């Protein structure tokens, strides 16, 4: 699966 980086 691909992981996404969430903007803070």
Curated annotation (Swiss-Prot):
For this entry, the protein name equals Sarcoplasmic calcium-binding protein
* Keyword tags: Allergen, Muscle protein
Q: Name the source's superkingdom.
A: Eukaryota
Other notes: The sarcoplasmic calcium-binding proteins are abundant in the muscle of arthropods, mollusks, annelids, and protochordates.
Lineage, opening ranks: Eukaryota, Metazoa, Ecdysozoa, Arthropoda, Crustacea
The answer to whether UniProt assigns keyword Oxidoreductase to this entry is no
Task: Give a yes or no for keyword Ribonucleoprotein in this entry.
Answer: no
The protein's role, per its UniProt record: Like parvalbumins, SCPs seem to be more abundant in fast contracting muscles, but no functional relationship can be established from this distribution.
């Amino acid at each position: 699966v691909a992981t996404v980086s969430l903007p803070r």
